[in-house]
């Protein structure tokens, strides 16, 4: 739920107008909209590069993943791993636009630990893949933009640990 929706729901539940503090938070959210959209556009435009380079970093750091017996061994399983990275990048992009972790939380994390555990996929590997995407993205963004995106990458990484 966005800051706008939360503020309205809270105010309405108390049958009151929005408070000055709520209006300030909404103003800040609206004012940061162009920046969030710019970040999302950069992530979207560079998604293939981000996923490919992050995959390369992941497989260098964790060769066990692509070795015989590893969860990303073989072309099909490597493609599945990269597909999962792309999925998390998409959710992070949604969260940047929303200015909230809810897209990551509600779309991407519900039941994910159980699913990966049932498949024998190490969560540490998934976290490392997301960390690798964060590293690639940090080279595409600067300053406040990088910090904004990093927050959502860190949230997803933390959920996998």
UniProtKB/Swiss-Prot annotation:
Location, primary (coarse class): plastid
Single Gene Ontology BP annotation: photosynthesis
Membrane topology: Peripheral membrane protein
Pfam families: Phycobilisome
Subcellular location: Plastid, Chloroplast thylakoid membrane
Transport as UniProt keyword: yes
Subunit structure as annotated in this protein's UniProt entry: Heterodimer of an alpha and a beta chain.
UniProt similarity note: Belongs to the phycobiliprotein family.
Name of the protein in question: Allophycocyanin alpha chain
Organism field: Cyanidium caldarium
Lineage, top ranks: Eukaryota, Rhodophyta, Bangiophyceae, Cyanidiales, Cyanidiaceae
């Amino acid at each position: 739920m966005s800051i706008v929706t939360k503020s309205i729901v809270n105010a309405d539940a108390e049958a009151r107008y929005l408070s000055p503090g709520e209006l300030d938070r909404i103003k800040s959210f609206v004012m940061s909209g162009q920046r969030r959209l710019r970040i999302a556009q950069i992530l979207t435009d560079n998604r293939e590069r981000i996923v490919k380079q992050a995959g390369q970093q992941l497989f260098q750091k964790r060769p066990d993943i692509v070795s015989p017996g590893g969860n990303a061994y073989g072309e099909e399983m490597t493609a599945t791993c990269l597909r999962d990275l792309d999925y998390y990048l998409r959710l992070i992009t949604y969260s940047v636009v929303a200015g909230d972790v809810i897209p990551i939380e509600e779309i991407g994390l519900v039941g994910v630990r159980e699913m990966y555990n049932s498949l024998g996929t190490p969560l540490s590997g998934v976290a490392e893949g997301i960390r690798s995407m964060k590293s690639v993205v940090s080279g595409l963004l600067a300053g406040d933009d990088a910090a904004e995106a990093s927050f959502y990458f860190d949230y997803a990484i933390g959920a996998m640990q």
